[in-house]
């Protein structure tokens, strides 16, 4: 997004410390224990497992969870550093330092407290670069809001159709338009993924990996079509983009002849999630 900021066009930044986007991450891997065995122990001893996680997070100072990898003996730990603005040097530096500061102490605690699982646990590696969930965003030709979820808004320039983790519409698919990737007042530049134009609430449901992949793919196709046809991104043939995505790249899009109709039928059968209390009261 640095290029978009240098154009002189508008951008917006983080909302609040409570937002998911205000949590950075410095992920790491721990080896020497069986993730399957860990899961079985968790299930058999829920109270002890909850206490172990709580104390581990207290020692490291960061909320973290272990996830499986392709190797049962190596687990990946995701984490959430709250109230961090990764668009600032201070926010990035705090994550880099705090993410490593007490990590080995935490692993020693696991080894001593639960040797049945962690007796041989060791730190495999730490990510060489911090992870961000959000920073600056476009002020775009269209701004995604929770209205897109609560009212199932349809867009003629839809380029991605994704289920999200938003409970307002029971995680039903929402349409993301090309306009949400276009910087207001600036030609021939787009910013998909975590920098798309969305307000401070909606962005938390739109900046996960699936949406980053989907909007990134669409932005690439849009740029290729614009170059091939000699147009700007704003004047690009949206139908051609949609047909390439749905017809050649197997990307489901609503109201497109290349998309399996059963996807739409399923969404309609479930009312696009608009049966929730929040949607009915909107």
Where are the regions that the model predicts?
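Flavin (FAD/FMN)-binding glycine-rich loop and adjacent Rossmann-like elements that form
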Residues: 1-262
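N-terminal propeptides
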Residues: 262-282
